């Protein structure tokens, strides 16, 4: 097992997570005793204890006082905060993970975009006005796209959507910077932003879902043209 880590705690965390992913420590199994595991990994018991607590908070493990530590089925117990970890664990499956991420975001964003234009159309108008000074670069488009989603999610009347976005901010930002290297992708997005701005200006929230569906389909097709050339390094949070 080859693990790149910045220190003992990082190494221990990656070792345990990799072992869970590879079924060396399968769901429902009991982790080795603390002393045995610390010797196996090569870290102090204090460091290991801190790592185990962190992994328990992320849903990988179940720690109960006086009982051995049990491995969870992380698909059932973890949240969006482990997306970065999954991308790192399974680089071959990363394109599929991105497909699923974009599909989920498209479905959810249709809800909070509509909510924002319904409850806070002036906020939507203000943020969309920035498109008229938007630089024609991948970095600028990726930053604006996230800003737009974050602003409208917060203005939708349900701030929980912001927490969902925060869960995959790093991963989505890296993918966005790659996606928007395509001038066609930038033009597609710009036309979408302009149409959304027109709806916001007249407070027409009813037509938002149809606009989102159309853009979702078109951007999805664009993504399929780009995904096979995506650098593997995007999967890693450097």
From Swiss-Prot:
The UniProt record lists the keyword DNA-binding: yes
UniProt keywords, alphabetically: Activator, Cytoplasm, DNA-binding, Fatty acid metabolism, Lipid metabolism, Repressor, Transcription, Transcription regulation
GO biological process: fatty acid metabolic process; regulation of fatty acid metabolic process
Keyword Cytoplasm on entry: yes
Locations listed in the record: Cytoplasm
Domain of life the protein comes from: Bacteria
Residues in HTH gntR-type domain copies: 6-74
CDD domains linked to this entry: WHTH_GntR (cd07377)
GO molecular function, one term: DNA-binding transcription factor activity
Main location: cytoplasm
A GO-annotated cellular component: cytoplasm
Quaternary context: Homodimer.
Role: Multifunctional regulator of fatty acid metabolism.
Protein name (record): Fatty acid metabolism regulator protein
Lineage, broadest ranks: Bacteria, Pseudomonadati, Pseudomonadota, Gammaproteobacteria, Alteromonadales
């Amino acid at each position: 097992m080859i693990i790149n880590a910045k220190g003992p705690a990082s190494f221990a965390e990656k070792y345990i997570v990799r072992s869970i992913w590879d079924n060396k420590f399968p769901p429902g199994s009991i982790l080795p005793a603390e002393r045995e595991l610390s010797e196996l990994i090569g870290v102090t018991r204090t460091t290991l204890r801190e790592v185990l607590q962190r992994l328990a908070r992320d849903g990988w493990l179940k720690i109960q006082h006086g009982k051995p530590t049990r491995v969870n089925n992380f698909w059932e117990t973890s949240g969006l905060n482990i997306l970065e970890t999954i991308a790192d664990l399974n680089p071959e499956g990363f394109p599929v993970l991105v497909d699923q991420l974009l599909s989920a975001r498209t479905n959810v964003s249709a809800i909070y975009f509509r909510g924002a234009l319904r409850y806070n159309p002036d906020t939507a108008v203000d943020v969309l006005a920035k498109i008229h000074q938007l630089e024609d670069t991948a970095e600028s488009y990726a930053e604006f796209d996230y800003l737009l989603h974050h602003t409208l999610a917060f203005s939708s009347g349900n701030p929980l959507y912001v927490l969902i976005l925060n869960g995959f901010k790093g991963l989505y930002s890296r993918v966005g910077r790659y996606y928007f290297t395509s001038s066609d992708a930038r033009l597609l997005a710009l036309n979408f932003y302009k149409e959304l701005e027109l709806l916001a200006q007249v407070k027409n929230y009813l037509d938002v879902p149809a606009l989102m569906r159309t853009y979702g389909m078109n951007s999805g097709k664009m993504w399929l043209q780009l995904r096979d050339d995506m650098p593997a390094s995007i999967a890693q949070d450097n």
